[in-house]
Swiss-Prot record:
GO terms for biological process: cartilage condensation; common myeloid progenitor cell proliferation; dorsal spinal cord development; olfactory bulb interneuron differentiation; pattern specification process; regulation of cell differentiation; regulation of gene expression. This is Homeobox protein unc-4 homolog. It is found in: Nucleus. Residues 90-111, 165-362, 400-530 are annotated as: Disordered. Residues 248-257, 275-284, 407-419, 481-504 have a biased composition (Pro residues).
């Protein structure tokens, strides 16, 4: 192989001297030696200069050209000495090479396939493991070491990189492992098993965090939804199940020992359940702890973590423990929506409720509301109508002929008895004439212009008797039943139509207690006036 490469070099006309150097066995005749032109002499000088580099390919191939260049002028005496057998002349073919850098003046020679030996392949693989992209200096050193051409080394590295990329991009087919089943780093080196385990652990933790975030988002959606879920379901499910959002499955119902926390803990412990069943009294937080101290001490409820104090109170009412085991209604039903509003109104003090215009007195509604609510509104434990049922119960027990309608709001918390009675005369005449029943049904609206001069109810009846008995005749009642005391004076501005409110049945003597009790919830002051 080396002999053929020496003969196929561009300066192969010096084959005589080179053959003597390497012991070339074939004799060369005079027809194998060509005359040198001027440019061939220059190329010979360049090859001699290149021979100064000892480990380059050109230096190795043209090492003897410098010595042969001096004898090129007279080549004939060199031929017998170089060839050894001068008499024989055998034609020798100078083609057949594997060098693509051959500069032959004739037609192009077809390069044959390079066959690498096992040792050459082993050395090339070692170099590839060190670097996939060797520079030109490393390729030349490999070519000199492995007895190859640098261009062949370059092409081998190109093919090896393509093979490596194909192996890396191969996916696992069905039923067979992939070529790169063992994961490798970016440079192609195999990964450490500890690194593989760490990456798997990070992947699992990332998936777990994503699942926890999804659970927390769903729980916050339940927390902010309108209804009973905003008070009870999601926080109690976190505290009762213990794990909270870590468990992917829905939370289990609390164990039987959770009933020691009180009826409120057992009733609202299951996520997604409605906090108020149909037969239960008002929701937790509507009643003050002072009204039912025995239930709070007997139940022994402990404040749970993650819940405000006002949401941890037990339901006020005797039916709470009995109805705790009943199936819960829908959290978006009318009952749960209506029972969710009282705790926010209950926290307002008396003067704030009066100035804000709330429809009930905050101190009263707990105890009377549960008594009447259990008799009349079993399915709807609503706060607002129960404040109006308190005077209705008193009227039904008394001698009042009429009931106060439900649409009229109750009186404010301050004792409004003297202004309410004086308001019959202070109410303007035209409005009273247009709607006389409104002055009787809502006395606090009539008293709203301001506190008038104090005048008794009988003084108003006296003013009615002085102005004329025509209004009483229209009402069809016996008006002289109220004797007019002369010292009392009426309010300053009665007007010509001022007797129109007393002209109704509420001004008669028989209906006097009923009208007095209908004016405001505290009945004691009107009884003292009578």
């Amino acid at each position: 192989m080396m002999d053929g490469r020496l003969l196929e070099h561009p300066h192969a006309q010096f084959g005589g001297s080179l053959g003597g150097v390497v012991g070339f066995p074939y004799p060369l005749g005079h027809h194998h030696v060509y005359e040198l032109a001027g440019h061939q002499l220059q190329s010979a000088a360049a090859a001699a200069a290149a021979a100064s580099v000892p480990f380059s390919i050109d230096g190795l191939l043209s090492g003897s050209c410098a010595a042969a260049a001096a004898s090129v002028v007279n080549p004939t005496p060199l031929l017998p000495a170089a060839c050894g057998v001068a008499g024989e002349s055998q034609p020798f073919k100078l083609a057949d090479s594997g060098d693509p850098d051959k500069e032959s003046p004739g037609c192009k020679r077809r390069r044959t396939r390079t066959n690498f030996t096992g040792w050459q392949l082993e050395e090339l693989e070692k170099a590839f493991n060190e670097s996939h992209y060797p520079d030109v200096f490393m390729r030349e050193a490999l070519a000199v070491r492995l007895d190859l051409v640098e261009s062949r080394v370059q092409v081998w590295f190109q093919n090896r990189r393509a093979k490596w990329r194909k192996k890396e991009n191969t996916k696992k087919g069905p039923g067979r492992p992939a070529h790169n089943s063992h994961p490798t780093t970016c440079s192609g080196e195999p990964m450490d098993p500890e690194e593989i385990a760490r990456k798997e652990l990070e992947k699992m933790e990332k998936k777990k965090r994503k699942h926890e975030k999804k659970l927390l988002k769903s729980q916050s959606r339940h927390l902010h939804s309108p209804g009973g879920l905003s008070l009870h379901s999601a926080p109690s499910s976190d505290s009762d199940s213990g794990g909270g959002g870590l468990s992917p499955e829905p939370p289990e119902p609390p164990p039987p020992t959770a009933s020691a926390k009180g009826p409120g803990a057992h009733g609202s412990g299951i996520a997604g359940s409605a906090p108020v069943p149909p037969g239960e009294p008002p929701a937790p937080g509507t009643c003050d702890p002072a009204f039912y101290p025995s239930q709070r001490s007997g139940a022994g409820s402990q404040p749970r973590l993650g819940r405000p104090a006002d949401k941890d109170t037990v339901p006020c009412g005797p039916g709470a423990a009995s109805t705790a085991g009943l199936p819960k209604a829908s959290p978006f039903s009318v009952e749960s929506l209506l029972s969710d509003s009282p705790p926010r109104r209950k926290a307002t003090p008396a003067n704030t409720a009066a100035t804000a215009g709330l429809d009930f007195t905050p101190g009263l509604p707990c105890a009377p509301r549960t008594l009447i609510g259990k008799g009349h509104f079993l399915l709807y434990p609503i706060t607002q109508p129960l404040g109006f049922l308190v005077p209705q119960a008193a009227l039904k027990g008394g001698a009042g002929p009429e009931l106060v309608p439900k649409d009229a709001p109750p009186a404010p918390p301050a004792p409004p008895a003297p202004p309410a009675q004086a308001s019959f005369g202070a109410f303007p005449g035209p409005v009273g004439a247009a709607d006389p029943a409104f002055a009787r049904r809502s006395p606090e609206v009539v008293a709203s212009p301001g506190p008038p001069a104090p005048a008794s109810f009988r003084g108003l009846a006296a003013a009615a008797a002085e102005s004329g008995a025509g209004d009483c005749a229209d009402a069809g009642t016996v008006c002289p039943a109220a004797p007019p005391p002369p010292p009392l004076e009426t309010s300053p501005g009665p007007g010509p139509r001022a007797p129109s409110p007393p002209g109704e049945p509420a001004t008669c003597g028989a209906a006097e207690p009923g009208a007095a009790t209908g004016s405001s919830p505290p009945e004691g002051e009107e009884v003292d006036m009578d």
